[in-house]
UniProtKB/Swiss-Prot annotation:
Intrachain S-S bonds: none
Name the UniProt record assigns to this protein: Large ribosomal subunit protein bL21
Similarity section: Belongs to the bacterial ribosomal protein bL21 family.
Gene: rplU
Subunit structure: Part of the 50S ribosomal subunit. Contacts protein L20.
Cited function: This protein binds to 23S rRNA in the presence of protein L20.
Lineage, highest ranks first: Bacteria, Bacillati, Bacillota, Bacilli, Bacillales
Domain of life: Bacteria
Keywords assigned by UniProt, alphabetized: Ribonucleoprotein, Ribosomal protein, RNA-binding, rRNA-binding
NCBIfam families: L21
Length: 102
């Protein structure tokens, strides 16, 4: 059984036992988190939401919080001596999907 959930402005396909990286959540490590915005549940009994599946939720456990690799943003205007260099590290949360309830 799998589901498509919406979190952090993205849609993610998840299965029980899978570990996913999502946008940072305000939750403690080893704490449980519930995703109520379930768009689709697949498997033997398919349920399609319009836009959400009623009564469906996905339960997971927070494994860790972290920051992604650094990216460099560089702006430049040719021949004008304008240069701006900036780095960014996006925070994330790693979640282990425990079960899908539909």
């Amino acid at each position: 059984m799998y589901a498509i959930i919406k979190t952090g402005g993205k849609q993610i396909k998840v299965e029980a036992g899978q570990e996913i990286y999502i946008e940072k959540l305000d939750a403690d490590v080893e704490g449980t988190v519930e995703f109520g915005e379930v768009l689709f549940v697949g498997g033997d009994d398919v349920k399609v939401g319009a836009p959400l599946v009623e009564g469906a939720k996905v339960v997971g456990t927070v494994v860790k919080h972290g920051r992604a690799k650094k990216i460099t943003v560089f702006k430049m205007k040719a021949k004008k001596n304008y240069r701006r260099k900036q780095g960014h590290r996006q925070p994330y949360t790693k979640v282990r999907i425990e079960k899908i309830e539909a």
